Amino acid sequence: MDDEKYYIVKKKALPEVLLKVVEAKRLLDSERVMTIQEATDAVDISRSSFYKYKDDIFPFHENNRGKTITFMLQMDDIPGLLSMVLNQIAKSNANVLTIHQTIPIGGIASLTLGIEILPQTLELSQMLESIEALDGIHYLKILGRE
């Protein structure tokens, strides 16, 4: 689980390849380029570098109220598991902005949460780790941050 910890790192401490991956993702999101090949060519990195890091680095922005993070969970269809997830968020003093759970198929449901991270929110990485450690959670993936 140590390789799944989250860190906030200043831009100046990041290797150039990670910054280029973020820029390539921005180009794709803004539709300035249409393919991953075009994006990687534009920022001068290999496609393999892009694929290696694309799910592991995101820009982190602050807004006036706080920070927001959107993440997705794949979880077993167990009564009370959603409540336990929400309880972990509440224990961390974070605010649920949006919540969407799919109808379970084959005993597995997907849950997407938008969370506001407030000044009084406890350590974000600890909150995510505590959610991921719950019995019945298959995985947690951060989809975006603002």
From Swiss-Prot:
Source organism, top-level taxon:
Bacteria
**Which SUPFAM superfamilies would you find in this protein's record?**
ACT-like
Q: Which InterPro entries match?
A: ACT-like_dom_sf, ACT_dom, UPF0735_ACT_dom-cont
- What positions does the domain ACT occupy? 70-145
Question: What family, per the record?
Answer: Belongs to the UPF0735 family.
Q: What is this protein called?
A: UPF0735 ACT domain-containing protein Cphy_3604
